Amino acid sequence: MARWNVCSYCGKEFEPGTGKMYVRNDGRVYFFCSRKCEKYFFMGRNPRKLKWTKAFEEAKLQRAKRK
């Protein structure tokens, strides 16, 4: 059985054979579940500031623990 990929931007798991894989010249590999994630990644948007990403949820939990 093939491994599920995790989006490098939003953190969502997606099926093998879907999405897009981007490999940089230095060998780092990025997986994207959608064109939206890919665009936001290359535009330099911070995933911690977008409510629909897993990084936002994790940052939100850490902020709640501090208070």
Swiss-Prot record:
Task: Mention any Pfam family matching this sequence.
Answer: Ribosomal_L24e
Which GO-annotated molecular functions does the record name? rRNA binding; structural constituent of ribosome; zinc ion binding
Q: Which domain of life is it from?
A: Archaea
According to the UniProt record, one GO cellular component term is: ribonucleoprotein complex
The UniProt annotation places Zn(2+) binding at 7, 10, 33, 37
List, alphabetically, the CDD domains matched: Ribosomal_L24e_L24
Q: How is the cofactor bound?
A: Binds 1 zinc ion per subunit.
SUPFAM superfamilies registered for this protein in UniProt: Glucocorticoid receptor-like (DNA-binding domain)
> What cofactor is this protein dependent on?
Zn(2+)
Tell me a GO biological process for this protein. Answer: translation
Keywords of the record, alphabetical order, are: Metal-binding, Ribonucleoprotein, Ribosomal protein, RNA-binding, rRNA-binding, Zinc, Zinc-finger
Which parts of the sequence are C4-type zinc fingers?
7-37
The UniProt family comment states:
Belongs to the eukaryotic ribosomal protein eL24 family.
Please give the subunit comment from the record: Part of the 50S ribosomal subunit. Forms a cluster with proteins L3 and L14.
Q: What does this protein do?
A: Binds to the 23S rRNA.
UniProt protein name: Large ribosomal subunit protein eL24
Q: What is the species listed in this Swiss-Prot or TrEMBL entry?
A: Thermococcus sibiricus (strain DSM 12597 / MM 739)
Organism ancestry: Archaea, Methanobacteriati, Methanobacteriota, Thermococci, Thermococcales
The UniProt gene name for this protein comes to: rpl24e
